[in-house]
A protein has these predicted regions:
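C-terminal peripheral helix-coil segments that are non-catalytic and often amphipathic
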Residues: 1-6, 101-108, 139-151, 168-170, ...
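Hydrophobic/aromatic residues within well-ordered alpha-helical segments
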Residues: 18, 61, 72, 76, ...
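Short, hydrophobic secondary-structure boundary micro-motifs
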Residues: 113-118, 158, 179-180
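Amphipathic alpha-helical packing segments from all-alpha helical-bundle domains
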Residues: 74-81, 105-108, 115, 125-151, ...
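Helix-turn-helix
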Residues: 18-21, 29-63, 67
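Short helix-capping/turn signature of helix-turn-helix
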Residues: 55-58, 117-123
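Hydrophobic alpha-helical connector segments
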Residues: 67, 81-111, 163-167, 190
């Protein structure tokens, strides 16, 4: 008998696309309903497939949940890191670009899944700890820019922690505010959110 041939590139791409579809659907459901309220049956219904077909990719809800956390968290933060790598200018210019990109991703790509990271207490302990780690990595991007602006005298804040709490709370609501708007109005709304949040780093400054 001949050796078993490895799967073709086309097969790998198809599998990868299917896994991404499953992870996106699962992340949306976890964000909408909470971890405990979602079953593999719900994910299958969202995708219009059988529950059995999901077991070909994931053996349990815990495995699927972990993969959804890892994929969403890594992809989201990686996109923000890549943005900062190619963005130059003052701390304010870079912070505005970072806020704008974060809100754009939340509104256009992951409107429901964003809540997945806002309520980690609902998750089993292992996934809860991983969510915290991913949030810290994400938070560090904003914190570094705010601290840089404070150190240079460009920003005036009540405290860095308070600014971050207010900023993340507002950004988490952006999908609700902007998501139902038509495309042209949505872009303007995202611009306004970014500009408004910059006021948090100019406390007491005029002009």
């Amino acid at each position: 008998m001949g050796a078993v041939k490895p799967p073709s590139e086309r097969v790998r791409r198809k599998r990868g696309k299917r896994i991404q579809e499953i992870l996106t659907a699962a992340a949306e459901l976890f964000g909408e309903r909470g971890y405990d309220a979602v079953s593999l049956e719900h994910v299958a219904e969202r995708l219009d497939v059988t529950k059995g077909s999901l077991y070909y990719y994931f053996s349990s809800k815990d495995e699927l949940g972990t993969a959804a956390i890892e994929t969403l968290g890594d992809e989201w933060t990686a996109r923000l890191e890549q943005l900062l790598d190619r963005t130059e200018g003052t701390p304010e210019a870079r912070l505005r670009a970072l806020i704008h990109e974060h809100v754009t991703i939340a509104v256009n790509d992951y409107p429901a899944a964003l809540r997945l990271f806002l309520m980690p207490r609902e998750w089993p302990s292992a996934q809860r700890e991983r969510i915290k780690e991913l949030r810290l990595r994400h938070d560090a991007l904003f914190r570094a820019l705010i601290e840089e602006g404070v150190a240079s005298g460009e920003f005036t804040v009540t405290s860095v922690d308070t600014v971050l709490q207010c900023m993340h709370a507002a950004m988490s609501q952006a999908p609700t505010w902007c998501g139902e708007l038509p495309s042209a109005a949505r872009g303007k709304a995202v611009d306004e959110v970014a500009d408004t949040l910059l006021a948090l780093v100019h406390i007491g400054q005029s002009g």
